[in-house]
From Swiss-Prot:
Gene: panC
GO CC terms: cytosol
Residues given in the record as (R)-pantoate binding sites: Q61, Q154
Name of the protein in question: Pantothenate synthetase
Keywords: ATP-binding, Cytoplasm, Ligase, Nucleotide-binding, Pantothenate biosynthesis
InterPro entries, A to Z: Cyt_trans-like (IPR004821), Pantoate_ligase (IPR003721), Pantoate_ligase_C (IPR042176), Rossmann-like_a/b/a_fold (IPR014729)
Pathway: Cofactor biosynthesis; (R)-pantothenate biosynthesis; (R)-pantothenate from (R)-pantoate and beta-alanine: step 1/1
Family according to the record: Belongs to the pantothenate synthetase family.
Alphabetical list of CDD domains matching this protein: PanC
EC number: 6.3.2.1
Chain positions recorded as ATP binding sites: 30-37, 148-151, 177, 185-188
Enzyme class, broadest EC rank: ligase
Subunit structure: Homodimer.
């Protein structure tokens, strides 16, 4: 396994694979890796000849008062984990390598689907994601890229970006990795206190109860109200509880496929989760 820190070095490492037309898979991360990230790499190994994982804490997707400065940088630990699952190349650039010495002048904004959910409470976040992912796609030039479904809205933004800009990359969403008690794996789970960690699985438990109620014919508005109530009663400060079509458009009257979304703070830690629901016709 190689580790490259410059664009030039990565290009040189990938040129032999490109000339022999090998399939390049790409997993973009911000490091502080957990089993969810490693599942993305495992999936990439199944489908691709060469797997590149980027580790870059992207400053322009963090808003004011968010945790950019405190976000864990664990490159040595991450490298050991990636070697164990067969990663071929780590790309770990500096901020200067990615953005130069001057403020960026180009912005990329994916309209409509970034207007609500996490986009409403984190203004500019998805623009920052769109810029860094586009840059990474142009640097790595993968055939396939892998993203987790926990960040469902982000996955939708990336799919739209690739479609609108005619990027020749297949985007694969990988199911949410969960701990034994259902909590969606996240690098930010490490911020939770021991007591908060005991409460955190309430999100997934409440989503599963909401799914059960929908199958029983309970009205969606009532299901969402109870979901929010349960989370608030458990000690969460709820950002949003919503339901959308799989393409993130508002629910129409006869939609049978939908996605339930939760974003809530527990103490100082913001947690997100979602659950895809298929109702019987």
């Amino acid at each position: 396994m190689k580790t490259e820190t410059t664009i030039q070095g990565l290009t040189a490492s990938l040129n032999p694979a490109r000339t022999t037309r090998k399939i390049i898979g790409f997993v973009p991360t911000m490091g502080n890796l957990h089993q969810g990230h490693l599942n993305l790499v495992r999936e990439a190994k199944k489908l691709c000849d060469i797997v590149v994982v980027s580790i870059f804490v992207n400053p322009i997707q963090f808003g004011e008062g968010e945790d950019f400065e405190n976000y864990p940088r664990t490159l040595e630990q991450d490298s050991h984990l990636l070697a164990d699952v067969g990663c071929d190349i780590i790309f770990a650039p500096s901020v200067e390598q990615m953005y130069g010495k001057h403020p960026r002048l180009t912005n990329i904004s994916v309209a409509d689907i970034t207007d609500d959910l996490c986009g409403q409470s984190r203004p500019g976040h998805f623009d920052g994601v769109a810029v860094v992912v586009t840059k990474l796609f142009n640097i790595v030039q993968p055939n396939v890229a892998f993203f987790g479904q926990k960040d469902y809205q982000q996955l939708a933004v990336i799919r739209q970006l690739v479609q609108d800009l005619n990027l020749p990359i297949d985007i694969i969403g990988v199911p949410i990795a969960r701990d034994h008690d259902g909590l969606a794996l996240s690098s930010r789970n490490g911020y939770l206190s021991e007591a908060e960690r005991q409460i955190a699985p309430t999100i997934y438990q409440s989503l599963k109860l909401a799914e059960q109620q929908l199958h029983q014919g309970v009205e969606l508005v009532d299901v969402l109200d109870e979901l929010k109530f349960r989370l608030t009663a458990a000690g969460f400060v709820v950002d949003y509880v919503e339901a959308r079509q799989p393409n993130l458009q508002p629910i129409a009257q006869f939609d049978r496929d939908l996605v339930l979304f939760v974003a809530a703070k527990l103490g100082k830690t913001r947690l997100i989760d979602n659950l895809q629901v298929k109702l019987k016709a």
